[in-house]
A protein has these predicted regions:
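Beta-strand-rich ligand- or partner-binding modules
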Residues: 1-124
Length: 124
């Protein structure tokens, strides 16, 4: 960024400022739970993106997403392996069951670009 200030006598001064973008993490959390008619017992979550060596991807899911304090279950390894998750939580305090997913990506020591492109899946 270059700033030039000039006065009425045509004298000027210039300042140059350099900004460096340093994004080291990104987090996503659904704001609204996906509605469920009955207690969800299993889910499959897939995440597309670029996850080079040195970065850390963390993923959590809950089946009581309408609760004031949902019971988050770590599904990071199952997402990385493309495996189904069976919920351990069997309780809710809200009127209805609902599924939420949240993910966090940390740059860590990665030297390549890392990003989350999409999050998808299903539950039953």
């Amino acid at each position: 960024l270059k700033i030039v200030a000039t006065d009425a006598k045509d004298a000027s001064v210039t300042r140059t400022l350099t900004f460096t973008k340093a994004v080291t993490s990104v987090e996503f959390e659904q704001t609204l739970a996906m509605e469920a008619d009955a207690m969800p017992t299993k889910a499959l979550v897939n995440i597309q993106g670029n996850f080079p060596a040195g970065c850390t991807l963390q993923v959590w899911i809950c089946n009581n997403g309408n609760d004031a304090t949902p019971t988050w279950e770590d599904i990071t390894q199952k997402v990385r392996a493309g495996q189904k998750h069976y919920f351990t939580n069997k309780t809710k305090t809200a009127a209805a069951w609902g599924v939420k997913v949240k993910a966090k990506l940390l740059l860590g020591s990665a030297t390549e670009t890392c990003y989350i492109q999409s999050i998808g899946g299903n539950f039953a």
